C-alpha cells in the first residue's frame, strides 16, 4: 500500500485480493472486493462498493457508486454519485456523473451521460442472455435517456432529454424530441 491514501482505515474494507496502485485514494465507508484493481491516481468513494472491476488511472468512482463485476473504467473516466455499472466499459474520459444505471454496455471515449440515463437490457424469458448497448465516442447523452438493448449509437451523437433509443443511431446524428402529450 505504499503511496496509497486510505482516508479512514476504520471505515474502509479492502479484501486482500484487491490491487491498489500508487497515489490512489480510497475515501471513507468504501468496500473494495474480489479481483478489483485501482490504478495510479484513481479515487474511490466515499460510500462506494467496487467488486471485481478495473478502475483506470486518474479515474473517479464517486459517492454511493456501485461498480459490479466485469466493469472497466478507462483513464480519467468517471462513475459519479449514485451510479451503478455492471459489466460495462467506460473508455478514457467518458463520464456517467450521477443517478444512472448502465449494465452490459460500452461507452466510448469522451462521451458524457446526463443524469437519470439507463440501459434497459433485461429479457424476462428464462435462458435469454442480456443484450448490450454500445455508445460511440464523444456522444452527448441528455438527461433521462433510455437505451433499450440491443442498440448501437455512433460517434458524436446527441440525444434530447427523455429520449428512448430503440434502434441503432448513425454517427453525427441528433436523436429524440418525443412529442408532448397532455392527458
Language model regions located:
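Glycine-rich hexapeptide-repeat left-handed beta-helix
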Residues: 47, 58-183
Amino acid at each position: 500500500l505504499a503511496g496509497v491514501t486510505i482516508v479512514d482505515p476504520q471505515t474502509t474494507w479492502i479484501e486482500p485480493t484487491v490491487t491498489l496502485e500508487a497515489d490512489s485514494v480510497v475515501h471513507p465507508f468504501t468496500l473494495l472486493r474480489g479481483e478489483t484493481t485501482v490504478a495510479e491516481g484513481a479515487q474511490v468513494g466515499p460510500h462506494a462498493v467496487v467488486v471485481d472491476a478495473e478502475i483506470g488511472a486518474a479515474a473517479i468512482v464517486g459517492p454511493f457508486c456501485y461498480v459490479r463485476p466485469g466493469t472497466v473504467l478507462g483513464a480519467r473516466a468517471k462513475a459519479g454519485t449514485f451510479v451503478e455499472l455492471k459489466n460495462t466499459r467506460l473508455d478514457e474520459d467518458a463520464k456517467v456523473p450521477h443517478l444512472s444505471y448502465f449494465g452490459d454496455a460500452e461507452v466510448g471515449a469522451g462521451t458524457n451521460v446526463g443524469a437519470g440515463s439507463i440501459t434497459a437490457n433485461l429479457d424476462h424469458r428464462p435462458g435469454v442472455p442480456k443484450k448490450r448497448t454500445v455508445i460511440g465516442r464523444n456522444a452527448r447523452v441528455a438527461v433521462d435517456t433510455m437505451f433499450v438493448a440491443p442498440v448501437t449509437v455512433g460517434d458524436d451523437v446527441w440525444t434530447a432529454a427523455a429520449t428512448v433509443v430503440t434502434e441503432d443511431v448513425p454517427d453525427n446524428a441528433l436523436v429524440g424530441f418525443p412529442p408532448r402529450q397532455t392527458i
